[in-house]
């Protein structure tokens, strides 16, 4: 199986991988991280939120008032941290230092990440949503292509899996 760790802090990844390993023994398993290009350099919520246009903020506040939506009482999946190169590097370090067998990359498979994972003996996978993603993933050197269409649940791209695979 593959453990989706994109929304986990590095220390959580290390702890959870140790738990998984203790339960599966020597069986093979992997970790999936989303590695999109163009992320901000640092995990600065204040800087990112400052870039949100006032019109967007007013729109959300108006919806909350109109439908009586309370403020969140606990951090949610999308509010725990801001995706950044800083977090990505820490997550990758946690995965690469672990004894996990595979690294699956979503929304990009940076060649340097693929090379480092392979150097450490890990199988590399790329989750792709279109034919041009295949070309990029293969040029990055991944071992396995995982085709997933829009029907894969929360994955990007306009192509369904049954149409994507033959392409």
Provide a role label for each language-model segment:
Residues 1-167:
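Active-site entrance/lid segments in N-terminal catalytic domains of soluble metabolic enzymes
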């Amino acid at each position: 199986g593959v453990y989706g760790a994109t929304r986990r802090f590095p220390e959580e990844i290390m702890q959870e991988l140790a738990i998984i390993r203790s339960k599966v023994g020597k069986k093979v398993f992997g970790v999936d991280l989303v590695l999109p290009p163009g992320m901000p350099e640092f995990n600065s919520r204040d800087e990112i939120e400052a870039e949100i246009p006032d019109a967007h903020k007013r729109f959300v506040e108006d919806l909350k008032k109109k439908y009586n939506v309370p403020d969140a009482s606990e951090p949610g999946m999308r509010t725990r941290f801001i995706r950044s190169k800083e977090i990505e590097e820490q997550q990758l370090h946690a995965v690469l230092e672990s004894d996990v067998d595979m690294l699956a990359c979503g929304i990009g498979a940076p060649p340097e990440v693929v090379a480092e994972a392979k150097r450490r003996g890990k199988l590399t996978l790329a989750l792709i949503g279109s034919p041009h993603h295949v070309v990029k993933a293969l040029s990055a050197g991944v071992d396995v292509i995982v085709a997933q269409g829009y029907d894969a649940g929360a994955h990007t791209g306009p192509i369904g899996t049954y149409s994507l695979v033959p392409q």
